[in-house]
């Protein structure tokens, strides 16, 4: 986190490399980098929206189950983690409206709890159209969650509950429960 070594701009986050070429590295991210990435994302969304409209497809909401948990902080107090975590944590209110679930559904540290609540909100929303994932295997994992927890998901949709056995942080559970309603017609 030492200033003016790799960039003259203040570092706001470090992307952590995968380590596929050796030791994991921390790559500095600045406000300027985030601004450029945001523009690229906006352009990508524009192309995707345009293509969907041209093909007569409805534009809807996206299911994404990626964690927004940072890995840790440097000795200088700067957060670091995967680039997707950094991007998701930096999203403004407008971007967050793309999700079929509340942004807080990405907060659980426990992956089963996070995937479950994201799927729960997705199953309750008829506007769900897209599954976003960093890797194709995640789609198969979501299918496994659907199969494994089908009865609990249906019960929660019908009753407006969130399974008590999920390892959710109390404040996250409270926030999500306030945003969740029973939808018996979706459970039928």
Report the location of each language-model feature.
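Active-site phosphate/ATP/adenylate-binding loop shared across adenylate-forming ligases
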Residues: 1-188
């Amino acid at each position: 986190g030492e200033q003016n070594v790799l960039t003259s701009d203040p570092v706001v986050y470090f992307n952590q490399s995968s380590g596929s070429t050796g030791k994991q590295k921390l790559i500095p991210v600045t406000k300027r980098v985030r601004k450029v990435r945001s523009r690229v994302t906006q352009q990508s969304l524009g192309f995707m929206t345009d293509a969907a409209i041209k093909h007569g497809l409805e534009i809807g909401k996206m299911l994404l189950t990626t964690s927004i948990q940072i890995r840790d902080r440097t000795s200088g107090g700067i957060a670091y983690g995967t680039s997707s975590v950094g991007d998701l944590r930096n999203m403004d209110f407008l971007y967050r409206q793309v999700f079929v679930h509340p942004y807080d559904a990405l907060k659980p540290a426990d992956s089963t709890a996070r995937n479950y609540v994201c799927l729960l909100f997705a199953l309750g929303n008829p506007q769900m159209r897209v599954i976003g994932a960093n890797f194709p295997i995640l789609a198969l994992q979501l299918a496994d969650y659907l199969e494994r927890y089908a009865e609990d998901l249906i019960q929660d949709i019908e009753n407006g509950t969130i399974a008590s056995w999920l390892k959710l942080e109390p404040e996250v559970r409270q926030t999500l429960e306030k945003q969740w309603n029973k939808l018996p017609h979706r459970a039928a």
